[in-house]
Regions:
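Structural preference for long, well-ordered alpha-helical segments within the folded cores
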Residues: 20-24, 113
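Conserved short beta-strand elements that form part of the metal-binding/catalytic scaffold
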Residues: 30-70, 116-121
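Conserved catalytic-core motifs of GNAT/GCN5-like acyltransferases
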Residues: 9, 28-35, 98
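Conserved acetyl-CoA-binding loop of GNAT-fold acetyltransferases
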Residues: 23-30, 91
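Vicinal oxygen chelate
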Residues: 13-16, 54-55, 64-116
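Loop/turn position at the start of each blade in beta-propeller repeats
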Residues: 3, 36, 102-104
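N-terminal beta-strand motif that seeds the catalytic metal site of vicinal oxygen chelate
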Residues: 1-19, 122-123
Length: 123
């Protein structure tokens, strides 16, 4: 199963303070907008997302079809294939995608310790 780029999505209280903190650690802004209350930041191959007011807890995020630079990769598993494989393994999908759809979509699963995992395909 190819899940694509991995990042941790952090729920932050003050996006400007968080941006400054992670810039001090060597991260640079890759995508997003302060006006929209989210930034994707990168340090070498590490990605973090800063999200203010969008969700309550931190989320592990995978982006099928993207590499860590947000570039499309040729060979990837479509999110609907990933969803079906996880369902067949008995993993509960919190917001199932219509398997007859195509293109961008997302769903969430929760690991045994309550950590939310977002599978978020943008293409």
């Amino acid at each position: 199963m190819k899940l694509g780029a991995f990042s941790i999505s952090l729920s932050v209280k003050d996006i400007n303070a968080s941006k400054q903190f992670y810039e001090n650690l060597g991260f640079t802004v890759l995508a997003g907008s302060l006006d929209k209350n989210y930034l994707i930041m990168k340090n070498e191959n590490s990605l973090i997302g800063l999200f203010q007011g969008m969700f309550d807890n931190n989320i592990l995020t995978f982006n099928p079809g993207w590499d860590e630079n947000g570039n499309n990769i040729e060979s990837f598993n479509d999110i609907r294939e990933i969803q079906e494989e996880l369902k067949n393994k008995g993993i509960k999908i919190e917001n199932e995608i219509d398997k007859t759809s195509s293109g961008p979509a997302s769903f969430k699963i929760t690991d045994p310790d309550g950590n939310v995992v977002l599978i978020d395909q943008h293409r």
